[in-house]
C-alpha cells in the first residue's frame, strides 16, 4: 500500500527525535539475507585455529559479513549439532574446521541448506568444497630433513587415528620417506593436540627406544612437550635427538632450544576458505 509523503516525513522526524535504531532482524527478514557466516572449529586455543579465523574474518568482513564462531572442543557430535544450529540461525554459509570426516559428518554437510566449506580435511571425493594442505608431502619432507641430518632411528607422535590429515597423511608421508631410504619407522604414537600429550608419549617411548635419534611430531605443541621429555631423560634436543614439528606456532621460537618446524600459513587457508564459500 502507498504511504503519503507527508506521513513519511512525520515518521522520519519521530525516528530522529526518539533516537530509534533499526531492527537488524526485521531488515534481514525483509532482505532474506543475514550476512552471517558460521565458523566451526575444534578448539579456540589452537595456533592453527586462531590464525585461520583471523584470515577468514578479514575476507568476510571486507565482504560485509559477520562471523559466528563455535568451538566443538574436539567433540564429534558437536560438529553435527552446530551444523544444524547454524542452519536454524539462517547463516549464509558455514566454514568447518573438521578433525576427521566420517559418514555422519558427510551426510550432515550434504543435507545442509547452506553451503559448507571444509578446511583441513579433504571432502572432494564427496563433492564437498575443501581447503587442504599437502600433509603427505610435509611428512615426506620431514623424513628427508631428519635423514639429511644423519638420523636413522626415528619415531612419529601424532593424534587420534581418525584425523586423516594430521595423523594418517603426515605419518604415511614420513614412513614413505624412511622406506625410500631403507629405514624403518620405530614407532607411531597417538595422543591429542596438547603439549602434555607430547610430553607423556615421548617419555614413554624414549624408555622403549633407546637408540632414537629423530622425532617427527604432528604439531608444534606436541613437539614442545617431547622436547621437555627428552631434556628430563638427560638428553640434548637438537643434538642427541632431532625434533621436528608442524605449524610454526609462536611457542616454537621461544622454547629452549628453539623448535624446527614447517610453516603452514594457516591464515591463508582461512582466507581461501572464505573466498571459496
Residue ranges of predicted features:
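Short acidic capping loops at alpha-helix termini that bridge into adjacent secondary structure
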Residues: 153, 184-186, 236-242
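Hinge/beta->alpha junction and helix N-cap segments in small-molecule ligand-binding domains
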Residues: 6, 41-51, 69-78, 131-141, ...
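N-terminal helix-turn-helix DNA-binding module of bacterial transcription factors
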Residues: 1-35
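Flexible loop/turn connectors
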Residues: 203, 208-277
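Periplasmic-binding protein-like
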Residues: 90-98, 155-158, 189, 209-219, ...
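Central regulatory/effector-binding core of bacterial HTH transcription factors
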Residues: 61-107
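Interdomain hinge and pocket-entrance segments immediately C-terminal to HTH DNA-binding domains
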Residues: 22, 31-45, 63-65
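Flexible loop/hinge segments that line or gate small-molecule binding clefts
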Residues: 74, 96-141, 221, 247-259
Amino acid at each position: 500500500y502507498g504511504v503519503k509523503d507527508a506521513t513519511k516525513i512525520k515518521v522520519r522526524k519521530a525516528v530522529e527525535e526518539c533516537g530509534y535504531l533499526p531492527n537488524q532482524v526485521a531488515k534481514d527478514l525483509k532482505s532474506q539475507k543475514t550476512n552471517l557466516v558460521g565458523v566451526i572449529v575444534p578448539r579456540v586455543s589452537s595456533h592453527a585455529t586462531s590464525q585461520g579465523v583471523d584470515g577468514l574474518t578479514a575476507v568476510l568482513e571486507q565482504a560485509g559479513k559477520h562471523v559466528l564462531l563455535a568451538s566443538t572442543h574436539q567433540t564429534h557430535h558437536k560438529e553435527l549439532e552446530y551444523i544444524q544450529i547454524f542452519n536454524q540461525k539462517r547463516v549464509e554459509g558455514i566454514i568447518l574446521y573438521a578433525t576427521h570426516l566420517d559418514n555422519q559428518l558427510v551426510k550432515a554437510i550434504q543435507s545442509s541448506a547452506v553451503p559448507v566449506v571444509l578446511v583441513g580435511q579433504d571432502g572432494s571425493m564427496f563433492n564437498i568444497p575443501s581447503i587442504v594442505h599437502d600433509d603427505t608431502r610435509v611428512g615426506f619432507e620431514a623424513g628427508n630433513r631428519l635423514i639429511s641430518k644423519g638420523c636413522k632411528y626415528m619415531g612419529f607422535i601424532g593424534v587420534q587415528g581418525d584425523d586423516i590429515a594430521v595423523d594418517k597423511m603426515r605419518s604415511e608421508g614420513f614412513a614413505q620417506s624412511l622406506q625410500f631410504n631403507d629405514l624403518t619407522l620405530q614407532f607411531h604414537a597417538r595422543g591429542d593436540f596438547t603439549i602434555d600429550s607430547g610430553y607423556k608419549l615421548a617419555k614413554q617411548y624414549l624408555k622403549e627406544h633407546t637408540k632414537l635419534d629423530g622425532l617427527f611430531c604432528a604439531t608444534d605443541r606436541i613437539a614442545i612437550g617431547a622436547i621437555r621429555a627428552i631434556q628430563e631423560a638427560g638428553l640434548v634436543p637438537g643434538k642427541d635427538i632431532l625434533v621436528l614439528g608442524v605449524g610454526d606456532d609462536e611457542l616454537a621460537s621461544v622454547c629452549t632450544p628453539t623448535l624446527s618446524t614447517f610453516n603452514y600459513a594457516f591464515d591463508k587457508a582461512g582466507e581461501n576458505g572464505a573466498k571459496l564459500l
